Amino acid sequence: MARRRVAPCRPRSDESPERAADPAAARAAAVALLARRDLPSGELRERLDSRGFAPQATAEALSALASEGALNDERYAHNYVAYQAGRGKGPVRITADLRARGLPQELIEAALAAGVDWRAQAAAARVRRFGRSSPATLREKARQARFLQYRGFSADHIRAATGADPDTD
């Protein structure tokens, strides 16, 4: 019978409660999680809490990692925006994703304002999906607008990408 492997940083139910209250153990678990991928502080706190670490130990571990520069929500937000914009996602969808990950609105707005031309991104997403030709019919224009809206672009970005004029449509 195969034994179930338990991650070394996860406190087991039969372990002592001192380990769950130990900031060093919480820090080791946080470093192990951050080694896999960058996480915002809110999501890292949730993961440490779900692994049974005491809130005080979690707070101490997160503050130590933040002071060392290993945990930086601003860096995470900028990297996330750049990555998702490169995948053709718009600012509305990216904002919703970052809010769900627990980032403050000020960081989200700063990351979205940092050098991405959202109109050009919307146009590029439209061209990748539908080709270079402009939508010929109102039905095709609406189809492309729905696609861009699903991707998270605002109405202004969609109008610019589809060449729609609100006065003539």
Name the predicted role of every residue range.
Residues 1-169:
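An alpha-helical, amphipathic repeat domain used for nucleic-acid recognition
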